[in-house]
Each structure stands twice: as structure tokens, then as C-alpha cells.
């Protein structure tokens, strides 16, 4: 797959701390990494958290992506998100999940303010591909979906919900290999604080989250996969709601109004009343609304995009669906050896506690003691 070509910048580094570290000025952002990471250093992405640059590990000759999270411990929620991402990705080992290669420790522990996480380098993400003029065949859609489900099967087997699956969190390389990234919102079970913790993209959010359910299951990720599948096919978001109310309206416009038997997951009387008072919309099969789309792809999407989470297809059954028959191989779809332990979330961690835990995670990559 091709990505937009970016003009290369010549970014020179200044050695620091007796040459053990090098500092780069990347578009006004200071990047200080150990000297084993060598140029060319190039910016490859920017987000709310900071900047991502690519570099080469001189010891392994491997190209890597380095994410700098500036002032990582200023805000406890952000710091916990960083810790969660590091712990989860260190626990997981799967071809379709991005790998952490290193955590760059600062030269001085007392000045540990920025976190640099080193990942394997990918070329682009699914959001960029969908937006591009790159032709996408049925084979592309099948292969991307298969890899997403294969990775998600592993995630769910670790008793983890991703909770923020969307095209920009699915990284790709030139071979069309797909890897799930950004586990900062992942949880083992539902938590009420999710609703206020982050303004995550609502377009891929399941009805139970839009309706403030505090109990939800792995089915929330399956809903997101259904949205992503249809976006791959149509090259535009399926439910681009401006706000929660419009988001729910777009869902019902496509799926039809839910029956009473579909609302068992709603514990709140207010939520149930709200849904029941919405204008009634008849249900039409997807094949009527999308007559030019592969019937098998539509059938799978319809099984994912079900209002009642209990009736949504599971990741195992989705992998076994006829749309993916040419790729599905049960013995090549591993599960996680042990469930992920979220116990560290339960403690009321201070910013300094989180800093200590991230420092300890960094030590696992380079146990050589530094002050």
C-alpha cells in the first residue's frame, strides 16, 4: 500500500550527556533519545499526546517509530493511559498487535517528565488508505478485516476490551499487514468513568455506550469492526454523527427501530424511554440500501451491527463467516496464554506512583542500572 510522500527534512542532532543521548529539534519539538537511535529522524505523525518520529536502531538496524509523550505525568488520567498502553502491549504478543520495542529512559531519573515509547514502524494507517485514491478490492477488504478480527480474538482472549477501534488505530505496511494500536482506553470490564474520561470518536461507538450503559461486553468492539468494514467498502464513515443524539439517529435510520426484545441490555428506565420515544423507522435489509456491495460482506456487517449486544456475532463466529472462508484457519488464530491483570488500575495511584511504575517497565527493556 502506498502512503502520501512527505518531503524529507534534514534534522541534525546534538549529542548530550557525554554522547549517550542525542537531542533533535523536530519542527520545534525537542526529542532526546539514546544514541543508538540514529538519523534520519523524521516526523511521521502527531496527535493529542505529542509527536511520533521514525528513526533507526543502530544495534538491530531496524526502523522504528518513537512516540514522545511530553509532560507525561502532569495529568493523572493521561499518565494512567500511558501506563496502561505500556503494560498491555508488553503483555501481548501477536502479529496483528503493534509491539513495543523499547522505552527510552531519561539520563536522570529525577528529570523523568517525558516518556518515549519505541514501536515497530508501520507505513500508514487504515484511515489514510480509506481517504486516499488507492483502489481497494474485495480481497483488500477481506484481508484487512481478517487481520483485524484475528488480532481482536487474541485481545478478547486476554480478557481485554479495546474500546477505541477505528481506522486510524489500525496500522498498515506496504505488504498490507495490519496491526491494532492505541490500547490507552482498554479495560478488562466496563467502568463508569469511561464516559467522562475521554472524548473518543463517537462514530464507531456501540449503542450501549451511546446510551450510557455502565455494563458492557466484548460486543462493543465487534460493533466498531462492523463500522470499519462498511467504511472500507463505502470509503466514507457509516455513522458520522455530530453528537450523541444524531449518532443514535443515524444508527436507527440504517438498522430500523429496535424492538422491546432488543432493549434488555438497558438497565436505565430513562434510556429505555428515550429510545422508545424516537420516531419509528422500519427495518430494511442492508442489501436494499447497498445493492452494489458483496452479499457476503453485507451479511457479516449485518451480524456485527446489531442493536442488542447480546445478539451481535462474536469474534470467533465472525472469523468463521463465509466472507472470510478463503483466509480463515483456526490453527493460525492464536489466543493469549494468560488473561491480562488490571489490578494496577484499582489502586489510587498518584502521578509519582505512575512514574515509578513506568520507570520499572522501562527497566525491563534495559536492565543496566542507571542513576
Swiss-Prot record:
Its cofactor is Mg(2+). The gene is NTF6. Keywords: ATP-binding, Kinase, Nucleotide-binding, Phosphoprotein, Serine/threonine-protein kinase, Transferase. GO terms for biological process: intracellular signal transduction. The keyword Kinase applies. It comes from the Eukaryota. The keyword Cell membrane does not apply. GO terms for molecular function: ATP binding; MAP kinase activity; protein serine kinase activity; protein serine/threonine kinase activity. A motif (TXY) lies at residues 196-198. This is Mitogen-activated protein kinase homolog NTF6. The lineage of its organism: Eukaryota, Viridiplantae, Streptophyta, Embryophyta, Tracheophyta. Transmembrane segments: none annotated. Belongs to the protein kinase superfamily. CMGC Ser/Thr protein kinase family. MAP kinase subfamily.
Amino acid at each position: 500500500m502506498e502512503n502520501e510522500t512527505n518531503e524529507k527534512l534534514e534534522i541534525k542532532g546534538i549529542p548530550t550527556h557525554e554522547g549517550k543521548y542525542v537531542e533533535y529539534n523536530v519542527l520545534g519539538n525537542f526529542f532526546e533519545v539514546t544514541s543508538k537511535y540514529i538519523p534520519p529522524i523524521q516526523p511521521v505523525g502527531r496527535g493529542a499526546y505529542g509527536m511520533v518520529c521514525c528513526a533507526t536502531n543502530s544495534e538491530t538496524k531496524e526502523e522504528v517509530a518513537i512516540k514522545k509523550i511530553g509532560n507525561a505525568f502532569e495529568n493523572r488520567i493521561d499518565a494512567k493511559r500511558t501506563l496502561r498502553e505500556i503494560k498491555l502491549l508488553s503483555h501481548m504478543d501477536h502479529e496483528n498487535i503493534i509491539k513495543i520495542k523499547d522505552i527510552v529512559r531519561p539520563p536522570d531519573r529525577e528529570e523523568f517528565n517525558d516518556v518515549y515509547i519505541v514501536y515497530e514502524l508501520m507505513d500508514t494507517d487504515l484511515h489514510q488508505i480509506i481517504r486516499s485514491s488507492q483502489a481497494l478490492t474485495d480481497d483488500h477488504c477481506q484481508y484487512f478485516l481478517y487481520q483485524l478480527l484475528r488480532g481482536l480474538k487474541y485481545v478478547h482472549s486476554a480478557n481485554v476490551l479495546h474500546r477505541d477501534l477505528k481506522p486510524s488505530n489500525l496500522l498498515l505496511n506496504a505488504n498490507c499487514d495490519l496491526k491494532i494500536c492505541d490500547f490507552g482506553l482498554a479495560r478488562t470490564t466496563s467502568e463508569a468513568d469511561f464516559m467522562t474520561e475521554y472524548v473518543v470518536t463517537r462514530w464507531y461507538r456501540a449503542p450501549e455506550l451511546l446510551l450510557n450503559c455502565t455494563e458492557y461486553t466484548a460486543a462493543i468492539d465487534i460493533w466498531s469492526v462492523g463500522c470499519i468494514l462498511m467504511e472500507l467498502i463505502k470509503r466514507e464513515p457509516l455513522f458520522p454523527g455530530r453528537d450523541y443524539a444524531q449518532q443514535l439517529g443515524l444508527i436507527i435510520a440504517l438498522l430500523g427501530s429496535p424492538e422491546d426484545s432488543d432493549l434488555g441490555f438497558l438497565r436505565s428506565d430513562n434510556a429505555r424511554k428515550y429510545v422508545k420515544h424516537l420516531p419509528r423507522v422500519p427495518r430494511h435489509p442492508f442489501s436494499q440500501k447497498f445493492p452494489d456491495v458483496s452479499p457476503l460482506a453485507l451479511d457479516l456487517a449485518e451480524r456485527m451491527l446489531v442493536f442488542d449486544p447480546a445478539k451481535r456475532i462474536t469474534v470467533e463466529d465472525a472469523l468463521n463467516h463465509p466472507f472470510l472462508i478463503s483466509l480463515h484457519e483456526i490453527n493460525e488464530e492464536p489466543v493469549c496464554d494468560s488473561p491480562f491483570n488490571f489490578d494496577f488500575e484499582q489502586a489510587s495511584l498518584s502521578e509519582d506512583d505512575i512514574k515509578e511504575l513506568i520507570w520499572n517497565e522501562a527497566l525491563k527493556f534495559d536492565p543496566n542500572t542507571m542513576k
